Amino acid sequence: MFPPSGSTGLIPPSHFQARPLSTLPRMAPTWLSDIPLVQPPGHQDVSERRLDTQRPQVTMWERDVSSDRQEPGRRGRSWGLEGSQALSQQAEVIVRQLQELRRLEEEVRLLRETSLQQKMRLEAQAMELEALARAEKAGRAEAEGLRAALAGAEVVRKNLEEGSQRELEEVQRLHQEQLSSLTQAHEEALSSLTSKAEGLEKSLSSLETRRAGEAKELAEAQREAELLRKQLSKTQEDLEAQVTLVENLRKYVGEQVPSEVHSQTWELERQKLLETMQHLQEDRDSLHATAELLQVRVQSLTHILALQEEELTRKVQPSDSLEPEFTRKCQSLLNRWREKVFALMVQLKAQELEHSDSVKQLKGQVASLQEKVTSQSQEQAILQRSLQDKAAEVEVERMGAKGLQLELSRAQEARRRWQQQTASAEEQLRLVVNAVSSSQIWLETTMAKVEGAAAQLPSLNNRLSYAVRKVHTIRGLIARKLALAQLRQESCPLPPPVTDVSLELQQLREERNRLDAELQLSARLIQQEVGRAREQGEAERQQLSKVAQQLEQELQQTQESLASLGLQLEVARQGQQESTEEAASLRQELTQQQELYGQALQEKVAEVETRLREQLSDTERRLNEARREHAKAVVSLRQIQRRAAQEKERSQELRRLQEEARKEEGQRLARRLQELERDKNLMLATLQQEGLLSRYKQQRLLTVLPSLLDKKKSVVSSPRPPECSASAPVAAAVPTRESIKGSLSVLLDDLQDLSEAISKEEAVCQGDNLDRCSSSNPQMSS
């Protein structure tokens, strides 16, 4: 691209000629033609650099030309000397220029290839944009289909909610009825139980009053028992005094009687006395008890008799207290009264026993009633729980309907979410792989460090053993030196001065101590270093083992997560594949249905067009006949020309109105078809559930169509109005127009009925299979 640095510039051809310079303008060098006039924008900087490098060559060439013009004679004289050198330089310059041209051609070829590649890339991008546009259109169509399906599902959900609401209302009504009946029965049972409880409370209050009286009697009996205890204690004291007296007497008698006889008699007497004392105590206790009971009964009887006698004396006032008969009567009356009181007391005791039995029975009844109440409360709780369960079931069904709605709303986002999950799973997989590789590298480095530390341990042990051996050798040398010194001292006849020997010995000892200290210090330091190294190595080994275990656990967890992610990825791919297959099947069904609907619509439109054309030709024929009759009437009856013109205008206005009505009806039919198409998309889901009614709708459609066709034929084949005589042509023209108007209105009604029948047939065809739909189409066309 750049000219060679060795050349100072191109030599013009006139330099090698011996003839004088011509007057023609000198040509520019050939390399100037190599510079392109229009360069591509990508290589503009290269061309600018090339021009910058070639400018000095141009200036040098101009300088040479000017020098040639000024000194032609001198250049001619130097021809012989510089000829061969100039030729060689020119050949080199030509070779370099050829190389430069080849390089430039190669660059041009590369630029063309790059431009072609850019064009191909742009075309590929354009194709990708078109594909994206098509995919976007397909996605919009699919979204519309899904919206239609969602609308159908919404209708189904509303139906389900209405059904569940009705069932819930029915269950609530039944529950309310059961609850009302149970509450009524419970209230009745409670009222009966309250009445019984009131009676029992009354009986209990009476029993409590009696118990209070009995408690008072018991207190009196306790007081009497206290008095009896006091008397018993007094009698015991007297008995003890008598016993002491008897013992004293025995002692006195025992002194008089021998010991053996005394002991035997004393034992026998003591046993007898003990037995008699026990019997007496038992008799005394029984007598005390009977006496207490009799005393209580006597006191009660005396008290009752005193009260009753007071009553009698109060009620009966004797007229003469000295009469004996009255006293006898009173005495006999008192005796009878006492007998009756005794009988009443016996009866009262029997009533008390019966009352205690009745109280026990009532307590048993109360316990049974309480058990019944608890059982009824348990049944009520069970019924409430069952009601709560039913309400929970209804709520669960409602939540299930909501869940279905949410699933329908989430179905649109499933594919995108699966794609995102797959992308995130792949990215996580890459991150996990990188983490595992980095952790493995770090583990390898740490293991290498541990191995290096373990490899250093033998060298440290060797150094330690070497130091120990060195210490032993130094000690041996010192001992040898000391022994030699002692031998010298012994062998020498004249010992040296004591001061020198003592100094030398002291120095040797100091040196020995210093060497021992140094050796001990070095050995201790070496041992410390070895222990530290061992502890550090052990700690590093433990840490590395922990790290290795953690890394193994993390590796296992990552493997498990990778396995789970792989499973999730596989499930997501399967779901995506299923969704794509389902979308493809739905698209295929949609295209088939669209084709079927298009064919059926085209057939119906063609049929309607043929019928309309036939009816239009019929109307035109009738209009032509009416015009001919009108012309005949105009020719024959000049006097009614004005009326004929008016009738003509009326007929034209009627035709215009008919055309406008037909246009409006066509527009209305088109709008109706669009509305039916929109309603058809919305009612696909509901019509699929009505598959059982398809046969009835088809039969109904087949029965309606022949009646419509017969009606049309009867309208079309209606008898033409007879030609009137020349005396009444207007009366003949008016019925024809009325018949035309009636036929058009009938035609419009038939068209409306036919459009409704077409929409019903399309709904039926959507619910049935393709064979039934294809078999019903010829019947519709017939």
Curated annotation (Swiss-Prot):
Keyword Secreted set for record: no
Outcome following mutation: R103W: In allele HCR*WWCC; risk factor for psoriasis
Localization per record: Cytoplasm; Nucleus
Disulphide bridges: none
UniProt-listed Pfam families: HCR (PF07111)
Coiled coil: 111-303, 344-437, 498-691
Tissues expressing the protein: Found in all tissues tested, abundantly expressed in heart, liver, skeletal muscle, kidney and pancreas, and to a lesser extent in lung and placenta. Overexpressed in keratinocytes of psoriatic lesions.
Mutagenesis or variant effect for R109W: In allele HCR*WWCC; risk factor for psoriasis
Example of a GO biological process term: cell differentiation
Cellular compartments per GO CC: centriole; cytosol; nucleus
Keywords: Coiled coil, Cytoplasm, Developmental protein, Differentiation, Nucleus
Keyword Membrane annotated: no
GO MF term set: identical protein binding
Matches recorded under InterPro entries: HCR
Biased composition (Basic and acidic residues): 62-74, 208-218
Region of interest (Disordered), ranges: 62-82, 177-218
General function of this protein: May be a regulator of keratinocyte proliferation or differentiation.
Protein name: Coiled-coil alpha-helical rod protein 1
Species of origin: Homo sapiens (Human)
